[in-house]
């Protein structure tokens, strides 16, 4: 059991080491290279998303304490709430609070009523999440760095900025990952023309890091 846990942690550690750029991962004894495309959010929106996550997570933890286990994920100013709460009142209050925050475009309230998940269950979700992300990274034509993937109770929740074909492929990859029960996608769908524009902007930002993206 301890060996299996160490193995899971190793997989997660290796994955996280190259999620932000290009990396090499040994799969089945063969080294494979993963190329991660640039984030399609502007630097400003990325900062807003991080701020929303920190603000909401801190406030909800202080307000509800052990009565709730709430995960807050924001992507392109759309906020996803997952986890467990004691009752409908807390579930609704959590969503209403997040909706009231400045810069929040929408809230996806996926909280369930029930006891807080165990640490073992959360560790399993982390491991399953690493498997899904690895599959995304090694799937051609999937912009894994323009997606946020959350796993809760073996269910996969996805946020991101994708074309329709990319979104369909992402849902297929997640659904086919062993251990996944159900997949929920909350994507911003863009056209191929917008995709090309954002990728061009991303390449320009690599040479001029301080230049803001036009995509908001």
Stretch-by-stretch model annotation:
Residues 2-7, 13-16, 21-216:
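N-terminal targeting leaders
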């Amino acid at each position: 059991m301890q060996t299996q846990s160490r193995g899971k942690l190793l997989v997660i550690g290796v994955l996280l080491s190259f999620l932000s750029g290009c990396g090499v991962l040994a799969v089945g004894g063969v080294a494979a290279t993963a190329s991660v495309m640039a984030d399609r959010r502007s630097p400003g929106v990325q900062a807003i998303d991080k701020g929303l996550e920190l603000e909401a997570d801190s406030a909800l933890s202080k307000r509800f304490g052990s009565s709730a286990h709430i995960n807050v994920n924001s992507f392109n100013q759309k906020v996803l709430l997952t986890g467990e709460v004691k009752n409908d009142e807390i579930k609704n209050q959590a969503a209403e609070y997040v909706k009231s925050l400045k810069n929040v475009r929408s809230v996806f309230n996926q909280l369930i009523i029930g006891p807080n998940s165990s640490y073992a269950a959360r560790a399993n979700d982390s491991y399953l999440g690493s498997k899904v992300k690895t599959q995304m990274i090694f799937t051609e034509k999937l912009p894994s760095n323009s997606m946020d993937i959350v796993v809760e109770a073996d269910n996969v929740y996805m946020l991101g900025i994708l074309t329709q074909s990319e979104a369909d492929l992402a849902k297929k990859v997640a659904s086919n990952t062993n251990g996944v029960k159900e997949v929920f996608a909350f994507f911003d769908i863009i056209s191929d023309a917008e995709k090309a524009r954002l990728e061009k902007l991303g390449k320009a930002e690599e040479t001029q890091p301080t230049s803001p993206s036009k995509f908001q």
